[in-house]
């Protein structure tokens, strides 16, 4: 019997459907099976072959067969390189094509050369390189990953051109003429040469400025090309028109009575114009397709740059990692992975983060993305950058609305809300032109064909305000996490803990590093030992279970398990970091050191663990080990000021004041908005007996605290959040009122309210007062230090005032009672001094206070005698 005949196109179509169905249900072995068969049916080195190869390797990647996936891709890429090298004289070595003739080889090479000129083909090749590099990252082969990515000749040439342009743009400035053309080169020798590492160290603002200029120049070139194309088409149309008019004139000169011929000519001219317009429309469609391919190319190149940054970061080359992350973002600002790596790992300073965000050219429809990006920046209160306050204000207002709903009855709330909504709708209808601008409206409608024009009612339904977008997005876990981080930076630990606790309760497998770290640190600050123990126990269990699953999955597919353990290493590091915090909280030193060591061993690039390790050594008085941990943290967190500040504080403790001031000033350059920096500088001046300078620094720290408190209290005035009248708190010294009086004098801490205030407002005011007072309590040591300075200058009245203020913020502090007694002692008020000494000793026995008490008693007896 004769063999049955099959249609190859039908078989290919059926196989594609089987592959799509298998991928849709995540049956990766099935997809691998059919894509392997389809790959052998398709003509080798064709566009279709490359697409199927990518589908096969992508399925292998998803099935955790990383080595096989990267091997197949590299094998194909090496074959393409051989074709490029040998050209038309290339003789294919493959056994399948060994019988081909030279003429067939030439045809084969020409077809390959033609296909390489296709942009879609080149994009698929880039995607293959990206996938192969991803496989190498999963197997922790970072050098080979860079070798695969650096084979892209276009990118290396672009890097050389960019470096040359950097030097050309900086010829006017002498300091910038020393920049070499080999900055951020992709050669393998760069990792071994210190000179090349020094070449990578340059100002990030200069980098951002260059890339924005280069992108604008490229856009200008594109616009010029488009305008030239339009001009050429217009000229061709005009030429046709002029030619037709000349023909008409000749016909009119020959036969003036032949009007029909003229009409026919005009019709022909109109037809020609219509044909030209159709050609222009086709050209526009082609341009749109090219723009889509250009966007895809930008996305792929941005992902490749981000992958290079991850490789360099894993190799502890943070300078190059920062370079490639920035380049990825400037290529495509939608590459959140690069943005998250820069912000989460503190590779940029706060000023660099702001400048980077301003350089990213967000479209008008993506302005809401810029707000979310700004929320993930460092949580410093810069007076020059308030773009991230929108979500914070909304969160505060929603909290107060929830408190209102919990206080009043549900029926009353529904009626009030309905009335308010009706009133708001009427007001919005009356004042729509004033309240909502065109910039606040974002269209979320999908693109439709030009023939089907939507009605005005549909367009209005598709337009929403930016506030409505915020209200919907504020429930996202990552936005809630960034808000909790903001409260943690402001020492409002209860609020940050409640937010992260709610997130982890709703999504117990939410593995965001920032959320887990804020949750653990908040429990540590609040001294919630039971909650911290339970949370860390859950984290360790989830880490061990994921590690066991990873080792099981690694046996299938060859060498995948080790990479999964590496990815889980970060989660394990956070788990053991939490365990170390728990033992540090219950003062078990041996277990604390053991689990901090375990955390830093699992993830040696986790700067927070090294910072906590340094705090532990500092609390035990082990100066050298604390300094080593702080220096490691400073090397990892290059854009964070806290490690430098901690180094300075540790040097103050060992009385190395000159070196301490240098480190703290470096921290000030990174973050000039942290009051702790000015507090530590004030301590240095105090120890140097420069009391007036110390007073200025302490007052600067307290002024920053007051500005922060005002910013948060006035951030949502509609929700009555500013219940504390912080302007009554005088940090300058003279004529102060408020916290410095008695604990029961709450009137000085609040704004004047009307007599018709409801009980709900009183409860809300008291809760907000507690929040603001809790924030001010964290800066009680600064007020205490300020009182010391005034006592040293023998300004006893001001010293007593600030000691009293310190005592109101932190009651029952024996040191403050002793300081108050000693100040009265110096004034000769021995009876008051004796009372304060007794109050101090009733809380804590202290040798120095006992000595002062005996002296005060003897002096008071002599005074009465």
Swiss-Prot record:
Annotated signal sequence range: none
Region (Disordered): 153-293, 403-436, 738-767
PROSITE patterns on file: TPR, TPR_REGION
An individual GO BP term: anaphase-promoting complex-dependent catabolic process
Compositionally biased spans, kind Acidic residues: 183-202
Composition-biased stretches (Low complexity): 249-292, 403-434
Keyword Repeat annotated: yes
Pfam families: TPR_10, TPR_12, TPR_8
PANTHER family registered for this protein in UniProt: CELL DIVISION CYCLE 16,23,27, CELL DIVISION CYCLE PROTEIN 16 HOMOLOG
Name assigned to this protein: Anaphase-promoting complex subunit 6
Organism: Dictyostelium discoideum
This protein's encoding gene: anapc6
């Amino acid at each position: 019997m004769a063999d049955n005949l099959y249609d190859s196109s039908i078989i290919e179509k059926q196989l594609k459907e089987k592959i799509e169905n298998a991928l849709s249900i995540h049956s990766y072995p099935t997809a691998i099976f059919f894509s392997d068969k389809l790959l052998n049916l398709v003509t080798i080195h064709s566009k279709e072959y490359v697409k199927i190869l990518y589908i096969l390797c992508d399925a292998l990647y998803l099935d955790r067969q990383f080595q096989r996936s990267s091997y197949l891709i590299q094998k194909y890429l090496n074959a393409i390189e051989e074709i490029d090298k040998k050209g038309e004289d290339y003789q294919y070595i493959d056994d399948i094509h060994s019988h081909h003739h030279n003429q067939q080889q030439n045809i084969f090479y020409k077809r390959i050369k033609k296909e390489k000129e296709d942009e879609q083909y080149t994009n698929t090749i880039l995607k293959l390189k990206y996938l192969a590099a991803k496989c190498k990252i999963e197997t922790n082969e970072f050098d080979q990953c860079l070798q695969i990515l650096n084979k892209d000749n276009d990118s290396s040439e672009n890097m050389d051109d960019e470096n040359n342009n950097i030097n050309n743009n900086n010829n006017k400035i002498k300091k910038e003429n020393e920049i070499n053309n080999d900055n951020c080169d992709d050669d393998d020798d760069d990792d071994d040469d210190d000179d090349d590492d020094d070449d990578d160290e340059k100002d990030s603002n200069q980098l951002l400025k260059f890339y924005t200029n280069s992108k604008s120049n490229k856009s200008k070139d594109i616009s010029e090309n488009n305008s030239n194309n339009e001009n050429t088409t217009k000229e061709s149309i005009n030429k046709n028109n002029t030619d037709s008019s000349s023909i008409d004139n000749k016909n009119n000169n020959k036969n003036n009575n032949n009007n029909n011929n003229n009409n026919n000519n005009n019709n022909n001219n109109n037809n020609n114009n219509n044909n030209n317009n159709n050609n222009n429309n086709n050209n526009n469609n082609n341009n749109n397709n090219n723009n889509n391919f250009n966007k895809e190319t930008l996305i792929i190149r941005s992902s490749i740059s981000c992958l290079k940054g991850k490789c360099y970061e894993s190799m502890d080359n943070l300078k190059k990692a920062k370079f490639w992350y920035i380049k990825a973002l400037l290529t495509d600002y939608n590459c959140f992975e690069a943005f998250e790596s820069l912000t989460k790992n503190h590779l940029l300073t706060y000023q660099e983060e702001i400048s980077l965000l301003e350089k990213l050219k967000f479209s008008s429809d993506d302005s809401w993305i810029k707000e979310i990006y700004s929320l993930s920046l460092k949580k410093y209160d810069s007076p020059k950058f308030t773009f991230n306050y929108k979500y914070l204000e909304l969160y505060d207002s929603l909290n107060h609305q929830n408190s209102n709903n919990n206080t009043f009855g549900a029926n009353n709330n529904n009626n009030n809300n309905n009335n308010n909504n009706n009133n708001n709708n009427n007001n919005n209808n009356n004042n729509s032109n004033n309240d909502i601008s065109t910039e606040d409206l974002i269209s979320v409608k999908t693109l439709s064909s030009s023939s089907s024009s939507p009605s005005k009612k549909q367009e209005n339904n598709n337009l929403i305000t930016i506030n409505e977008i915020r209200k919907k997005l504020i429930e996202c876990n990552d936005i809630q996490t960034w808000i909790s981080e903001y409260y943690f930076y402001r020492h409002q630990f209860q609020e940050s803990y409640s937010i992260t606790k709610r997130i982890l309760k709703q999504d117990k497998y939410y593995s965001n590093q920032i959320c887990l770290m804020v949750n653990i640190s908040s429990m540590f600050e609040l001294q919630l030992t039971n909650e911290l123990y339970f949370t860390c126990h859950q984290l360790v269990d989830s880490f061990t279970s994921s590690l066991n699953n990873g080792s099981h999955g690694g046996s299938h597919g060859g060498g995948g398990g080790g990479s999964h353990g590496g990815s889980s290493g970060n989660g394990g590091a956070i788990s053991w970091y939490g365990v170390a915090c728990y033992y540090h909280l219950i003062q078990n030193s041996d277990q604390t050191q053991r689990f901090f060591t375990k955390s830093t061993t699992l993830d040696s690039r986790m700067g927070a663990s090294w910072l906590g390790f340094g705090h532990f050594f500092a609390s035990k008085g082990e100066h050298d080990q604390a300094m080593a941990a702080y220096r490691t943290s400073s090397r990892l967190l290059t854009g964070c000021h806290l490690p430098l500040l901690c180094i300075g504080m540790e040097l103050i403790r060992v009385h190395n004041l000159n070196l301490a001031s240098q480190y703290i000033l470096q921290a000030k350059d990174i973050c000039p908005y942290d009051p702790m920096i000015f507090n530590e500088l004030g301590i240095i001046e105090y120890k140097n007996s420069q009391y007036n300078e110390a007073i200025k620094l302490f007052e600067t720290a307290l002024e920053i605290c007051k500005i922060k408190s005002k910013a948060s209290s006035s951030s949502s005035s509609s929700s009555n959040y500013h219940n504390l009248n912080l302007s009554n708190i005088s940090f300058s010294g003279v004529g102060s009122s408020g916290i410095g009086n008695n604990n029961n004098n709450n009137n000085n801490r609040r704004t004047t309210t009307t007599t018709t205030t409801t009980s709900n407002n009183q409860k809300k005011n008291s809760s907000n007062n507690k929040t603001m007072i809790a924030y001010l309590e964290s800066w009680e040591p600064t007020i205490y230090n300020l009182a010391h300075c005034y006592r040293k200058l023998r300004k006893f009245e001001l010293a007593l005032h600030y000691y009293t203020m310190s005592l109101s913020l932190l009651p029952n502090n024996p040191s403050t009672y002793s300081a108050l007694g000693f100040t009265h002692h110096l004034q000769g008020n021995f009876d008051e001094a004796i009372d304060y000494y007794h109050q101090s000793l009733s809380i804590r026995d202290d040798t120095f206070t006992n000595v002062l008490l005996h002296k005060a008693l003897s002096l008071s007896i002599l005074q009465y005698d």
